[in-house]
Protein backbone atom coordinates (compact mmCIF):
# COMPACT_ATOMS: atom_id res chain seq x y z
CA UNK A 1 0.00 0.00 0.00
CA UNK A 2 1.38 3.41 -0.99
CA UNK A 3 0.62 6.39 1.22
CA UNK A 4 0.95 9.83 -0.39
CA UNK A 5 2.46 12.37 1.95
CA UNK A 6 1.67 15.97 1.01
CA UNK A 7 3.76 18.99 1.83
CA UNK A 8 2.33 20.70 4.92
CA UNK A 9 1.27 24.30 4.51
CA UNK A 10 2.43 27.03 6.86
CA UNK A 11 -0.99 26.98 8.54
CA UNK A 12 -0.45 23.36 9.60
CA UNK A 13 2.87 24.10 11.30
CA UNK A 14 2.72 24.58 15.06
CA UNK A 15 5.23 26.32 17.27
CA UNK A 16 6.26 24.11 20.16
CA UNK A 17 8.36 24.96 23.17
CA UNK A 18 11.19 22.71 24.32
CA UNK A 19 11.34 21.44 27.86
CA UNK A 20 15.11 21.09 27.73
CA UNK A 21 18.24 21.69 25.65
CA UNK A 22 18.31 19.62 22.45
CA UNK A 23 21.43 20.87 20.69
CA UNK A 24 20.40 21.97 17.21
CA UNK A 25 21.36 25.52 18.19
CA UNK A 26 24.87 24.40 17.27
CA UNK A 27 23.94 24.09 13.58
CA UNK A 28 25.49 27.47 12.65
CA UNK A 29 28.71 26.43 14.40
CA UNK A 30 28.64 23.09 12.56
CA UNK A 31 28.21 24.88 9.25
CA UNK A 32 31.07 27.26 10.04
CA UNK A 33 33.37 24.41 11.06
CA UNK A 34 32.51 22.41 7.94
CA UNK A 35 33.05 25.40 5.65
CA UNK A 36 36.33 26.25 7.36
CA UNK A 37 37.65 22.71 6.97
CA UNK A 38 36.60 22.56 3.31
CA UNK A 39 37.94 25.99 2.45
CA UNK A 40 36.46 28.41 -0.05
CA UNK A 41 37.01 29.21 -3.69
CA UNK A 42 36.67 32.55 -5.43
CA UNK A 43 37.28 33.28 -9.09
CA UNK A 44 37.87 36.77 -10.48
CA UNK A 45 37.84 37.73 -14.14
CA UNK A 46 39.82 40.87 -14.98
CA UNK A 47 38.71 42.47 -18.24
CA UNK A 48 40.65 45.45 -19.52
CA UNK A 49 43.16 46.72 -22.01
CA UNK A 50 46.83 45.76 -21.86
CA UNK A 51 48.78 47.88 -19.37
CA UNK A 52 45.72 49.27 -17.59
CA UNK A 53 46.89 47.91 -14.21
CA UNK A 54 44.98 44.63 -13.76
CA UNK A 55 47.86 42.66 -12.24
CA UNK A 56 48.93 45.51 -9.95
CA UNK A 57 45.42 45.92 -8.58
CA UNK A 58 45.14 42.18 -7.84
CA UNK A 59 48.46 42.27 -5.98
CA UNK A 60 47.23 45.28 -3.98
CA UNK A 61 43.82 43.75 -3.18
CA UNK A 62 45.22 40.55 -1.71
CA UNK A 63 48.45 41.95 -0.22
CA UNK A 64 50.66 39.54 -2.10
CA UNK A 65 52.65 39.21 -5.30
CA UNK A 66 50.97 37.00 -7.88
CA UNK A 67 52.74 35.57 -10.90
CA UNK A 68 52.29 37.75 -13.95
CA UNK A 69 54.03 37.92 -17.30
CA UNK A 70 54.37 41.33 -18.93
CA UNK A 71 52.04 41.44 -21.92
CA UNK A 72 52.70 43.13 -25.24
CA UNK A 73 50.31 44.95 -27.55
CA UNK A 74 51.06 42.54 -30.41
CA UNK A 75 48.63 39.74 -29.56
CA UNK A 76 46.77 38.50 -32.68
CA UNK A 77 43.62 37.92 -30.64
CA UNK A 78 42.18 37.83 -27.14
CA UNK A 79 43.16 34.86 -25.00
CA UNK A 80 42.34 34.11 -21.39
CA UNK A 81 45.01 33.08 -18.92
CA UNK A 82 43.88 31.56 -15.60
CA UNK A 83 46.13 31.08 -12.59
CA UNK A 84 45.05 29.53 -9.28
CA UNK A 85 46.56 30.16 -5.86
CA UNK A 86 46.08 28.87 -2.31
CA UNK A 87 45.77 31.72 0.21
CA UNK A 88 45.27 31.49 3.97
CA UNK A 89 44.21 34.18 6.43
CA UNK A 90 43.93 33.12 10.07
CA UNK A 91 42.38 29.64 9.80
CA UNK A 92 40.45 30.32 6.57
CA UNK A 93 41.78 28.86 3.33
CA UNK A 94 40.87 30.42 -0.01
CA UNK A 95 41.50 28.92 -3.43
CA UNK A 96 41.72 32.02 -5.59
CA UNK A 97 41.69 31.93 -9.39
CA UNK A 98 42.53 35.08 -11.35
CA UNK A 99 41.67 35.07 -15.05
CA UNK A 100 43.31 37.72 -17.21
CA UNK A 101 42.17 38.80 -20.69
CA UNK A 102 45.47 38.98 -22.54
CA UNK A 103 45.41 41.14 -25.67
CA UNK A 104 41.97 42.64 -25.01
CA UNK A 105 41.52 45.84 -27.03
CA UNK A 106 44.84 45.54 -28.88
CA UNK A 107 43.46 44.49 -32.26
CA UNK A 108 42.51 46.85 -35.07
CA UNK A 109 39.25 44.96 -35.58
CA UNK A 110 37.69 44.66 -32.11
CA UNK A 111 34.28 43.33 -33.18
CA UNK A 112 34.86 39.82 -31.81
CA UNK A 113 36.99 40.72 -28.78
CA UNK A 114 34.24 39.65 -26.37
CA UNK A 115 33.76 36.17 -27.87
CA UNK A 116 36.72 34.38 -26.18
CA UNK A 117 35.55 35.80 -22.83
CA UNK A 118 31.97 34.59 -23.31
CA UNK A 119 33.21 31.19 -24.49
CA UNK A 120 35.45 30.84 -21.42
CA UNK A 121 32.62 31.69 -19.00
CA UNK A 122 30.26 29.25 -20.76
CA UNK A 123 32.94 26.55 -20.72
CA UNK A 124 33.19 26.80 -16.91
CA UNK A 125 29.40 26.60 -16.60
CA UNK A 126 29.37 23.58 -18.92
CA UNK A 127 32.08 21.81 -16.91
CA UNK A 128 30.07 22.29 -13.70
CA UNK A 129 26.85 21.14 -15.40
CA UNK A 130 28.53 17.98 -16.68
CA UNK A 131 29.77 17.24 -13.16
CA UNK A 132 26.23 17.72 -11.82
CA UNK A 133 24.75 15.39 -14.44
CA UNK A 134 27.11 12.52 -13.61
CA UNK A 135 25.61 9.47 -11.93
CA UNK A 136 28.46 9.49 -9.42
CA UNK A 137 28.94 13.15 -8.65
CA UNK A 138 31.91 14.49 -6.73
CA UNK A 139 31.02 18.15 -6.19
CA UNK A 140 32.67 18.05 -2.77
CA UNK A 141 36.10 17.62 -4.38
CA UNK A 142 35.27 19.48 -7.58
CA UNK A 143 37.32 22.61 -8.25
CA UNK A 144 34.66 25.16 -9.14
CA UNK A 145 36.05 27.44 -11.86
CA UNK A 146 32.88 29.44 -12.50
CA UNK A 147 33.55 33.19 -12.54
CA UNK A 148 32.18 34.87 -9.40
CA UNK A 149 33.15 38.45 -10.14
CA UNK A 150 34.16 40.35 -13.26
CA UNK A 151 36.22 43.45 -12.57
CA UNK A 152 35.79 45.53 -15.70
CA UNK A 153 38.65 48.03 -15.99
CA UNK A 154 37.57 51.25 -17.70
CA UNK A 155 40.27 53.43 -19.24
CA UNK A 156 40.49 56.85 -17.52
CA UNK A 157 39.58 58.88 -20.61
CA UNK A 158 37.40 61.31 -18.68
CA UNK A 159 34.85 61.44 -21.52
CA UNK A 160 32.64 58.36 -22.00
CA UNK A 161 32.72 54.61 -22.37
CA UNK A 162 34.26 53.13 -25.49
CA UNK A 163 31.95 51.17 -27.77
CA UNK A 164 34.08 48.07 -27.07
CA UNK A 165 33.34 48.42 -23.34
CA UNK A 166 29.58 48.77 -23.87
CA UNK A 167 29.38 45.82 -26.27
CA UNK A 168 31.49 43.57 -24.04
CA UNK A 169 29.63 44.39 -20.82
CA UNK A 170 26.28 43.89 -22.58
CA UNK A 171 27.40 40.43 -23.73
CA UNK A 172 28.62 39.53 -20.23
CA UNK A 173 25.94 40.96 -17.93
CA UNK A 174 23.70 37.86 -18.08
CA UNK A 175 26.62 35.51 -17.42
CA UNK A 176 28.69 37.13 -14.67
CA UNK A 177 28.59 39.72 -11.86
CA UNK A 178 30.10 42.84 -13.44
CA UNK A 179 31.76 45.41 -11.18
CA UNK A 180 32.95 48.39 -13.24
CA UNK A 181 36.04 50.22 -12.01
CA UNK A 182 37.96 53.20 -13.34
CA UNK A 183 41.61 52.22 -13.55
CA UNK A 184 44.51 54.59 -12.86
CA UNK A 185 42.12 57.12 -11.36
CA UNK A 186 45.05 59.30 -10.28
CA UNK A 187 45.32 60.52 -13.88
CA UNK A 188 41.97 62.34 -13.70
CA UNK A 189 41.24 65.52 -11.76
CA UNK A 190 38.76 65.13 -8.91
CA UNK A 191 36.03 67.34 -10.41
CA UNK A 192 36.35 65.56 -13.79
CA UNK A 193 36.25 62.16 -12.06
CA UNK A 194 32.83 62.85 -10.55
CA UNK A 195 31.44 63.83 -13.98
CA UNK A 196 33.10 60.79 -15.57
CA UNK A 197 31.44 58.45 -13.04
CA UNK A 198 28.02 59.98 -13.68
CA UNK A 199 28.53 59.72 -17.43
CA UNK A 200 29.51 56.04 -17.19
CA UNK A 201 26.50 55.09 -15.04
CA UNK A 202 24.18 57.02 -17.35
CA UNK A 203 25.53 55.19 -20.40
CA UNK A 204 25.24 51.81 -18.69
CA UNK A 205 21.60 52.47 -17.81
CA UNK A 206 20.69 53.85 -21.24
CA UNK A 207 22.26 50.83 -22.96
CA UNK A 208 20.57 48.32 -20.63
CA UNK A 209 23.80 46.96 -19.12
CA UNK A 210 23.08 45.14 -15.85
CA UNK A 211 25.96 45.45 -13.40
CA UNK A 212 26.21 43.70 -10.02
CA UNK A 213 23.83 45.18 -7.47
CA UNK A 214 25.12 45.11 -3.90
CA UNK A 215 22.49 43.33 -1.75
CA UNK A 216 20.44 45.58 0.51
CA UNK A 217 17.90 43.03 1.76
CA UNK A 218 20.08 41.80 4.63
CA UNK A 219 20.16 44.01 7.70
CA UNK A 220 23.82 43.34 8.42
CA UNK A 221 25.04 44.72 5.08
CA UNK A 222 22.13 46.83 3.84
CA UNK A 223 23.42 50.14 5.18
CA UNK A 224 27.02 49.82 4.03
CA UNK A 225 26.00 48.48 0.60
CA UNK A 226 23.49 51.28 0.09
CA UNK A 227 26.17 53.81 0.99
CA UNK A 228 28.82 52.29 -1.24
CA UNK A 229 26.57 51.80 -4.28
CA UNK A 230 26.51 55.54 -4.94
CA UNK A 231 30.28 55.49 -5.50
CA UNK A 232 30.09 53.17 -8.53
CA UNK A 233 32.09 52.83 -10.65
CA UNK A 234 34.95 52.69 -8.15
CA UNK A 235 37.92 54.87 -9.10
CA UNK A 236 40.97 52.89 -8.01
CA UNK A 237 44.73 53.14 -7.86
CA UNK A 238 46.92 50.11 -7.37
CA UNK A 239 50.44 49.95 -5.97
CA UNK A 240 52.55 47.46 -4.03
CA UNK A 241 55.26 50.00 -3.24
CA UNK A 242 55.35 51.60 0.19
CA UNK A 243 56.13 55.27 0.65
CA UNK A 244 56.99 56.97 3.92
CA UNK A 245 54.26 59.42 4.88
CA UNK A 246 55.02 61.16 8.12
CA UNK A 247 56.14 58.47 10.53
CA UNK A 248 54.33 55.63 8.76
CA UNK A 249 54.83 53.56 5.63
CA UNK A 250 51.82 53.28 3.34
CA UNK A 251 51.08 51.85 -0.09
CA UNK A 252 51.14 54.75 -2.46
CA UNK A 253 52.30 56.17 -5.76
CA UNK A 254 55.00 58.81 -5.65
CA UNK A 255 54.79 61.67 -8.13
CA UNK A 256 56.79 64.90 -8.46
CA UNK A 257 53.70 66.82 -7.38
CA UNK A 258 52.88 64.61 -4.41
CA UNK A 259 51.77 61.20 -3.18
CA UNK A 260 48.59 59.22 -3.98
CA UNK A 261 47.80 56.88 -1.09
CA UNK A 262 46.08 53.68 -2.15
CA UNK A 263 44.18 53.19 1.11
CA UNK A 264 43.26 56.83 1.61
CA UNK A 265 39.57 57.20 0.75
CA UNK A 266 40.10 60.87 -0.03
CA UNK A 267 42.49 59.87 -2.82
CA UNK A 268 40.69 56.89 -4.44
CA UNK A 269 38.02 54.21 -3.95
CA UNK A 270 40.37 51.27 -3.41
CA UNK A 271 39.21 50.69 0.17
CA UNK A 272 35.56 50.78 -0.93
CA UNK A 273 36.27 48.21 -3.66
CA UNK A 274 38.04 45.91 -1.21
CA UNK A 275 35.20 46.24 1.29
CA UNK A 276 32.53 45.51 -1.31
CA UNK A 277 34.37 42.75 -3.17
CA UNK A 278 36.03 40.82 -0.36
CA UNK A 279 34.97 41.81 3.13
CA UNK A 280 31.22 42.27 2.68
CA UNK A 281 29.88 40.64 -0.50
CA UNK A 282 32.24 37.81 -1.47
CA UNK A 283 29.74 35.13 -0.41
CA UNK A 284 26.87 36.95 -2.12
CA UNK A 285 28.90 37.06 -5.35
CA UNK A 286 29.41 33.30 -5.09
CA UNK A 287 25.71 32.77 -4.38
CA UNK A 288 24.58 35.04 -7.23
CA UNK A 289 26.83 33.15 -9.63
CA UNK A 290 25.23 29.85 -8.66
CA UNK A 291 21.58 30.85 -8.22
CA UNK A 292 21.31 33.39 -11.03
CA UNK A 293 23.90 33.11 -13.78
CA UNK A 294 24.59 29.38 -13.59
CA UNK A 295 20.89 28.55 -13.20
CA UNK A 296 20.11 30.59 -16.31
CA UNK A 297 22.77 28.68 -18.27
CA UNK A 298 21.59 25.35 -16.83
CA UNK A 299 17.94 26.05 -17.64
CA UNK A 300 18.74 26.99 -21.24
CA UNK A 301 20.85 23.86 -21.68
CA UNK A 302 18.22 21.56 -20.20
CA UNK A 303 15.53 23.16 -22.36
CA UNK A 304 17.72 22.54 -25.40
CA UNK A 305 17.84 18.89 -24.33
CA UNK A 306 14.03 18.86 -24.08
CA UNK A 307 13.61 19.07 -20.30
CA UNK A 308 10.87 21.45 -19.16
CA UNK A 309 8.91 22.09 -15.96
CA UNK A 310 5.55 22.33 -17.74
CA UNK A 311 3.90 20.73 -20.75
CA UNK A 312 2.37 22.71 -23.66
CA UNK A 313 -0.79 23.17 -21.55
CA UNK A 314 1.25 24.77 -18.72
CA UNK A 315 0.67 21.76 -16.49
CA UNK A 316 3.47 20.56 -14.18
CA UNK A 317 5.76 18.15 -15.93
CA UNK A 318 7.89 15.84 -13.79
CA UNK A 319 11.40 14.75 -14.68
CA UNK A 320 10.18 11.16 -15.10
CA UNK A 321 7.47 12.26 -17.53
CA UNK A 322 10.03 14.33 -19.42
CA UNK A 323 12.34 11.33 -19.53
CA UNK A 324 9.58 9.07 -20.85
CA UNK A 325 8.49 11.63 -23.43
CA UNK A 326 12.06 12.16 -24.63
CA UNK A 327 12.67 8.40 -24.61
CA UNK A 328 9.59 7.79 -26.75
CA UNK A 329 10.62 10.65 -29.02
CA UNK A 330 14.13 9.26 -29.41
CA UNK A 331 12.79 5.73 -29.93
CA UNK A 332 10.48 7.04 -32.66
CA UNK A 333 13.39 8.87 -34.28
CA UNK A 334 15.53 5.75 -33.91
CA UNK A 335 12.91 3.55 -35.58
CA UNK A 336 12.50 6.13 -38.33
CA UNK A 337 16.25 6.23 -38.84
CA UNK A 338 16.43 2.43 -38.81
CA UNK A 339 13.68 2.22 -41.46
CA UNK A 340 15.43 4.87 -43.56
CA UNK A 341 18.71 2.98 -43.21
CA UNK A 342 16.99 -0.31 -44.10
CA UNK A 343 15.41 1.23 -47.19
CA UNK A 344 18.73 2.79 -48.08
CA UNK A 345 20.46 -0.56 -47.57
CA UNK A 346 17.91 -2.38 -49.76
CA UNK A 347 18.28 0.26 -52.45
CA UNK A 348 22.06 0.06 -52.27
CA UNK A 349 21.91 -3.76 -52.46
CA UNK A 350 19.66 -3.59 -55.53
CA UNK A 351 21.96 -1.04 -57.14
CA UNK A 352 24.94 -3.26 -56.36
CA UNK A 353 23.18 -6.34 -57.73
CA UNK A 354 22.38 -4.46 -60.93
CA UNK A 355 26.01 -3.33 -61.16
CA UNK A 356 27.22 -6.90 -60.57
CA UNK A 357 24.81 -8.32 -63.19
CA UNK A 358 25.95 -5.73 -65.70
CA UNK A 359 29.57 -6.52 -64.87
CA UNK A 360 28.84 -10.26 -65.17
CA UNK A 361 27.19 -9.71 -68.56
CA UNK A 362 30.20 -7.72 -69.75
CA UNK A 363 32.53 -10.47 -68.51
CA UNK A 364 30.51 -13.15 -70.33
CA UNK A 365 30.59 -11.11 -73.53
CA UNK A 366 34.33 -10.63 -73.17
CA UNK A 367 34.75 -14.35 -72.44
CA UNK A 368 32.71 -15.33 -75.50
CA UNK A 369 34.72 -12.93 -77.63
CA UNK A 370 37.98 -14.30 -76.30
CA UNK A 371 36.72 -17.86 -76.81
CA UNK A 372 35.82 -17.17 -80.45
CA UNK A 373 39.12 -15.42 -81.00
CA UNK A 374 40.92 -18.36 -79.42
CA UNK A 375 39.10 -20.86 -81.62
CA UNK A 376 39.86 -18.83 -84.73
CA UNK A 377 43.51 -18.59 -83.78
CA UNK A 378 43.58 -22.29 -82.96
CA UNK A 379 42.11 -23.11 -86.37
CA UNK A 380 44.68 -20.91 -88.07
CA UNK A 381 47.47 -22.66 -86.16
CA UNK A 382 46.10 -26.10 -87.06
CA UNK A 383 45.86 -25.09 -90.73
CA UNK A 384 49.42 -23.84 -90.63
CA UNK A 385 50.44 -27.06 -88.95
CA UNK A 386 48.84 -29.12 -91.71
CA UNK A 387 50.54 -27.03 -94.36
CA UNK A 388 53.86 -27.50 -92.62
CA UNK A 389 53.32 -31.24 -92.30
CA UNK A 390 52.51 -31.47 -96.01
CA UNK A 391 55.59 -29.43 -96.83
CA UNK A 392 57.67 -31.69 -94.60
CA UNK A 393 56.25 -34.80 -96.28
CA UNK A 394 56.91 -33.38 -99.72
CA UNK A 395 60.37 -32.42 -98.64
CA UNK A 396 61.03 -35.93 -97.31
CA UNK A 397 59.79 -37.45 -100.54
CA UNK A 398 61.98 -35.15 -102.59
CA UNK A 399 64.90 -35.86 -100.33
CA UNK A 400 64.41 -39.61 -100.66
CA UNK A 401 64.18 -39.30 -104.44
CA UNK A 402 67.32 -37.20 -104.54
CA UNK A 403 69.17 -39.68 -102.37
CA UNK A 404 68.01 -42.50 -104.65
CA UNK A 405 69.19 -40.69 -107.74
CA UNK A 406 72.47 -39.92 -106.08
CA UNK A 407 72.93 -43.55 -105.09
CA UNK A 408 72.14 -44.71 -108.60
CA UNK A 409 74.55 -42.19 -110.06
CA UNK A 410 77.31 -43.39 -107.74
CA UNK A 411 76.69 -47.01 -108.67
CA UNK A 412 76.75 -46.27 -112.40
CA UNK A 413 79.93 -44.27 -111.99
CA UNK A 414 81.60 -47.13 -110.16
CA UNK A 415 80.64 -49.61 -112.84
CA UNK A 416 81.96 -47.29 -115.56
CA UNK A 417 85.27 -46.96 -113.75
CA UNK A 418 85.62 -50.72 -113.46
CA UNK A 419 84.96 -51.15 -117.19
CA UNK A 420 87.60 -48.58 -118.00
CA UNK A 421 90.17 -50.41 -115.88
CA UNK A 422 89.35 -53.72 -117.52
CA UNK A 423 89.89 -52.22 -121.00
CA UNK A 424 93.34 -51.00 -120.08
CA UNK A 425 94.41 -54.39 -119.00
From Swiss-Prot:
Keywords: Cell cycle, Cell division, Cell projection, Coiled coil, Cytoplasm, Cytoskeleton, GTP-binding, Nucleotide-binding, Phosphoprotein, Synapse. GO terms for molecular function: GTP binding. GTP binds at residues 48-55, 103, 184-192, 238, 253. Residues 320-413 form a coiled coil. Gene3D superfamilies: P-loop containing nucleotide triphosphate hydrolases (3.40.50.300). GO terms for biological process: cell division. Its main location: cytoplasm. Residues 38-304 form the Septin-type G domain. Belongs to the TRAFAC class TrmE-Era-EngA-EngB-Septin-like GTPase superfamily. Septin GTPase family. Filament-forming cytoskeletal GTPase. May play a role in cytokinesis (Potential). May play a role in the cytoarchitecture of neurons, including dendritic arborization and dendritic spines, and in GABAergic synaptic connectivity. This is Septin-11. The gene is SEPTIN11.
Amino acid sequence: MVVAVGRPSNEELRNLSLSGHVGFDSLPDQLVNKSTSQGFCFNILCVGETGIGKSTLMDTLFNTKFESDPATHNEPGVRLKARSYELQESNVRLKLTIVDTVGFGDQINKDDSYKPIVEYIDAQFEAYLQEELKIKRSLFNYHDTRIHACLYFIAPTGHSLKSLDLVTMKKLDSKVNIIPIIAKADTIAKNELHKFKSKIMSELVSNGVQIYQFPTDEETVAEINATMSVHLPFAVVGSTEEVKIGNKMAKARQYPWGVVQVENENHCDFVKLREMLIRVNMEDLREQTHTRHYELYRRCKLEEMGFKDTDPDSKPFSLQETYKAKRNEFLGELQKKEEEMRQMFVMRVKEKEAELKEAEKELHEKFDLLKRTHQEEKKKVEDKKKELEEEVNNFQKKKAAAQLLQSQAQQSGAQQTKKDKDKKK
